[in-house]
């Protein structure tokens, strides 16, 4: 199962995405925390808290719409589109890292969070279509392990990159390279047609309200633990 075309390209794609997000986020935080960026318009503590909030905010705003989008279109096609968006964002992020533009990096961090918010639902919605029922638990386990391992490696890599000479320039190249590899991997994900005829409507506020209503359901809330 692991090396099958049904699973492996998708697994590599999502791991590279998690790795890239965390390298970029931690490069930004480390550059600010250790004063590698001059003329920061706000205090370091405020900047770090703002960065954390801006990365998480899209998950509250867009998760409901992201889930509807994941249900309404071919999942492989959606992943490829999201990886192209990631490539565009990281190309801008590479410039921001190289020029040490803190505020631009902050804006791009929000965009990275938004891209991740849309990738999350399709990442899990694809598995039941791609895998056999008896493979689903194993597939979920691989995805969880790959995601958290990628997060850990991303956190460690950010510090190592900035510790070497010309680290910011190398970090700029790394985030672009990982985005490109992620897109190339996504091209090999087989078609996963939508099983729904409903079209997704962009209603972030009402979507958030509906999500909170579902969260109040005891059975749904219990699934979190």
Where do the language-model regions lie?
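Juxtamembrane intracellular "pre-TM" segments in multi-pass secondary transporters
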Residues: 1-8, 192-225
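Residue-level signature of transmembrane alpha-helical entry/exit and packing/kink sites
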Residues: 6, 10, 44-48, 101, ...
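Substrate-agnostic recognition of the 12-TM MFS/MFS-like secondary transporter fold
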Residues: 8-25, 51-89, 104-163, 178, ...
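A single, central transmembrane helix in multi-pass transporters
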Residues: 15, 19, 25-26, 30-32, ...
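Extracellular/periplasmic helix-loop-helix junction of adjacent transmembrane segments
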Residues: 27-59
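Transmembrane alpha-helix termini and helix-breaking/packing motifs in multi-pass membrane transporters
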Residues: 27-39, 94-99, 151-175
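A helix-boundary/kink motif common to multi-pass secondary transporters
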Residues: 37, 44, 74-75, 101, ...
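Cytosol/matrix-facing ends of alpha-helical transmembrane segments
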Residues: 115, 167-203
């Amino acid at each position: 199962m692991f090396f099958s075309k049904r699973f492996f390209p998708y697994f590599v794609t999502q791991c590279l995405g998690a790795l890239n997000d965390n390298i970029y986020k931690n490069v930004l935080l480390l550059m600010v925390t250790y004063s590698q960026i001059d003329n920061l318009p706000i205090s370091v503590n405020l900047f770090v808290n703002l960065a954390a909030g801006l990365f998480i905010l899209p998950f509250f705003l867009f998760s409901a719409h992201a889930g509807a989008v994941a249900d309404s279109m071919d999942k492989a096609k959606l992943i490829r589109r999201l990886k192209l968006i990631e490539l565009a964002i990281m190309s801008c992020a590479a410039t921001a890292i190289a020029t040490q533009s803190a505020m631009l990096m902050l804006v791009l961090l929000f965009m990275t969070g938004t891209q991740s918010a849309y990738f999350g639902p399709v990442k899990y919605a694809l598995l039941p279509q791609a895998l056999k029922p008896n493979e689903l638990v194993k597939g979920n386990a691989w995805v969880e392990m790959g995601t958290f391992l990628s997060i850990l490696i991303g956190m460690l890599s950010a510090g190592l990159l900035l510790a070497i000479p010309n680290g910011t320039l190398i970090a700029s190249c790394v985030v672009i390279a990982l985005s490109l590899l992620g897109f190339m991997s996504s091209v090999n994900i087989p078609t996963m047609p939508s099983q729904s005829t409903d079209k997704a409507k962009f209603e972030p506020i009402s979507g958030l309200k509906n999500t909170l209503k579902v969260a109040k359901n005891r059975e749904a809330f219990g699934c979190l633990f």
